[in-house]
């Protein structure tokens, strides 16, 4: 990488980091309901602008569902996905400085905790096979406050080192752990042997 390109990348990373810090400082004064409403508006706005992403989503839905879903249903799924992504991002920024706010976003006790506790009692560790449904960042933090078992998420580090450091702190704030995807096999084995959970 040339010095000029390296400097450009560093400046871009710093600008991205500064933007996120500004958003956190601004959003922290709002209510959970307000964050949700703004997220919906941002999601709709992004949906209308992101032509290429919509095309990719449509191709994937055509492969997954074929003709079993109508054109209208597929468009609604794509639109809802954009809205959910925007809401999830803003909610994560909203709780960044105040992680206990997660309880305002998940008010009901999650189903299946009894099953998890039975698995932990067997002392063989737990694997979670999860999908990116809903706000998985919030759910991970919420799990850390449930006093069940330590949860390790397998992730790819962010390209921006400043945001990656911030994300690591955010994701581990309630006691969870993080494994990087490319070097996590031995760590996974150790976690399972320690009767912990891996997702």
Give residue spans per PLM region.
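Conserved Motif II region of HX4D acyltransferases
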Residues: 61, 125-129, 188-199
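Short acidic active-site motifs
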Residues: 115, 183-188
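Catalytic core of membrane glycerolipid acyltransferases/transacylases, capturing the structured
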Residues: 122-182
């Amino acid at each position: 990488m040339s010095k000029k390109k390296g400097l450009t990348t560093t400046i871009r990373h710093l600008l991205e980091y500064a933007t996120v810090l500004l958003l956190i400082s601004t959003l922290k004064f709002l209510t959970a309901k307000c964050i949700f409403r703004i997220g919906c508006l941002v999601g709709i706005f992004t949906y209308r602008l992101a032509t290429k992403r919509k095309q990719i989503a449509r191709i994937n839905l055509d492969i997954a569902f074929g003709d079993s879903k109508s054109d209208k249903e597929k468009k609604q799924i794509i639109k809802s996905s954009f809205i959910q992504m925007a809401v999830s991002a803003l909610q994560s920024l909203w709780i960044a400085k105040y992680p206990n706010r997660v309880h305002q976003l998940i008010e009901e006790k999650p189903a299946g905790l009894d099953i998890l506790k039975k698995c932990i009692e067997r002392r063989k560790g737990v694997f979670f096979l999860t999908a990116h449904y809903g706000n998985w960042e919030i759910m991970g933090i919420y799990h850390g406050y449930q006093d069940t078992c330590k949860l390790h998420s397998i992730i790819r580090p962010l390209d921006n080192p400043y945001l990656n450091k911030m994300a690591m702190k955010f994701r581990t704030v309630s006691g969870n752990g993080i494994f990087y995807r490319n070097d996590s096999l031995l760590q996974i084995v150790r976690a399972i042997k320690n009767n912990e959970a891996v997702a």
